[in-house]
């Protein structure tokens, strides 16, 4: 009897150790040692796409083994770049769908795009092309992209310093469209170099900007360019709230929230901030607001854009473009 019990226990142990699933963990031998080859070339699902109307495009390709891949889409006019990465033996809609957004500024234009598929461990480069008929449209309230110049409803102040240049310029460096606002100069007696006031009345005479009343849903976005060798610029945005609705901002009794941006990078960069995260600043230091202390995003009457620099730091320069409020999330250009 003891013999049979021992034998039964041994059989039970053997069966319990048997691997029920024949699937092999980790990469297959084909993926490890097999020769890489392209089974189906890179292709776009459509050869031209209208992102403005909601169209999308995706890319397909098939290779002989699982590989790390990088898909790069480059605008041949704008220089905009969108990248996607993955690890698989196939490129398909679920991994390569494109809605017209960019990974690196600038924003894509109406243009032809070159699509390149490369692999981490293979020399192959697959190429295709797709045409953007209409570029992606970003929803939100646009303060300015400067394509129509300087709005007559705005006001400005520019110090009488040296090499002052506050104006709308047009050149290929613009991250969106063809124009941007240039702010540059040397002021050796004051932090302020110049400013622009964006007034709500410049947009159809409205007493306040038409924004969601929930400050957690409102995002302020701006693209800022930092000049090489002049990383001393500070851009300060101030948001004046007309809390009592009398048509006037009263600094002593109403809130003004702010966002200070030290431009210490080179090139274009998108800055996004949720309105409820803004604070009141006094000489760059957070302080209690003077009004009700509530972020009334639907009561913003004026947005002030100041260009600042330490007066001992010399010439300062920044470029700004595509100032826009978005809802429920930051701008995805």
Report each predicted region and the residues it spans.
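Beta-strand-rich interaction surfaces with strong enrichment in secreted/lumenal proteins
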Residues: 84-88, 103-105, 205-212, 257-264, ...
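Extracellular polysaccharide-targeting segments
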Residues: 23-28, 136, 142, 307-333
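Extracellular beta-strand ligand-recognition surfaces/modules
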Residues: 112-119, 222, 272-317, 323
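Compositionally biased low-complexity segments at domain edges in trafficked proteins
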Residues: 141-177
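Extracellular ligand-binding interfaces
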Residues: 137-138, 201, 206, 213-288, ...
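C-terminal motif of bacterial Sec signal peptides marking the signal peptidase cleavage site
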Residues: 13-16
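Short carbohydrate-recognition loop motifs
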Residues: 166-200
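Acidic/polar, low-complexity intrinsically disordered N-terminal segments immediately downstream
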Residues: 18-97, 101-112, 120-155, 333
């Amino acid at each position: 009897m003891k013999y049979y019990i021992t034998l039964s226990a041994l059989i039970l142990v053997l069966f319990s150790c048997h691997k029920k699933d024949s699937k092999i963990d980790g990469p297959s031998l084909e993926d490890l040692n097999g020769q890489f080859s392209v089974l189906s070339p890179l292709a776009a699902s459509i050869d031209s796409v209208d992102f403005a109307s909601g169209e999308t495009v995706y890319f397909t390709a098939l290779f002989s083994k699982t590989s790390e891949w990088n898909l790069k889409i480059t605008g041949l006019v704008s220089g905009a770049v969108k990248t996607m990465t993955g690890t698989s033996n196939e490129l398909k809609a679920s991994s390569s769908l494109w809605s017209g957004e960019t990974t690196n500024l600038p924003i894509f234009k109406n243009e032809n795009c070159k699509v390149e598929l490369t692999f981490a461990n293979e020399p192959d480069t697959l190429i295709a092309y797709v045409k953007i008929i209409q570029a992606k449209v970003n929803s939100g309230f646009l303060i300015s992209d400067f394509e129509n110049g300087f709005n007559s409803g705005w006001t400005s102040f520019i110090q009488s310093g040296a090499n002052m240049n506050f104006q709308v310029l047009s050149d290929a460096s613009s991250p969106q469209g063809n124009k941007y606002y240039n702010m540059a100069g040397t002021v050796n007696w004051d932090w302020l170099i110049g400013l622009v006031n964006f007034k709500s009345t410049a947009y159809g005479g409205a007493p306040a900007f038409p924004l969601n009343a929930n400050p957690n849903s409102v995002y302020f976005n701006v693209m800022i360019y930092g000049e090489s060798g002049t990383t001393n610029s500070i851009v300060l945005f101030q948001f004046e709230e007309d809390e009592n609705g009398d048509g006037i901002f009263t600094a002593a009794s109403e809130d003004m929230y702010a966002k200070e941006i030290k431009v210490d990078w080179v090139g274009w960069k998108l800055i996004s901030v949720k309105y409820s995260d803004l604070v009141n600043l006094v000489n760059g230091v957070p302080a209690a607001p003077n009004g009700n202390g509530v972020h009334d995003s639907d009561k913003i009457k004026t947005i002030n854009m100041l260009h600042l620099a330490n007066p001992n730091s010399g010439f300062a320069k920044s470029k700004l473009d595509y100032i826009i409020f978005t809802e429920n999330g930051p701008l995805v250009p």
